[in-house]
Amino acid sequence: MSSKVRSLCEAAALVKDGDHLGLSGFAVARNAIAFSHELIRQGRRDLTISQAIVGMDADILVGAGCVKHLVYGGGSLDRFGLVEHINRAYEQKRIVAESYSSLAVCFRYLAGALGVPFMPIKSLLGSDILKRLYEIAPDSVREMDC
């Protein structure tokens, strides 16, 4: 069996412009900083980033102009402040930002891991988050009767 181990450069080279990446971490903990820097160095563009709590890695990718679409459940740089690049890019309409709750993003990951198209949750019902998602990404959310 061949090894799955890759150098950082080789791993980043597998990512193509327009790909959708799921990042882990939380604010400033366990972020993929070196990987993000390598994506920037290799000049990736038009990426979609999903992250339950956006952190420094997503912020630097947005700041470098690599991200077109962000799917996230809030975030900050914890004691270091706000995610300035993300906030600025959103205000200037340089990125599309789908803001969910962190739980909703995690359930999206769970649905993908289970190989199902969606995972029903009730936590967004009656929230402003759901109202905004209907405006920004109407194909990403649905209400259903059970």
Predicted regions and their residues:
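Conserved alpha/beta enzyme-core scaffold
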Residues: 1-146
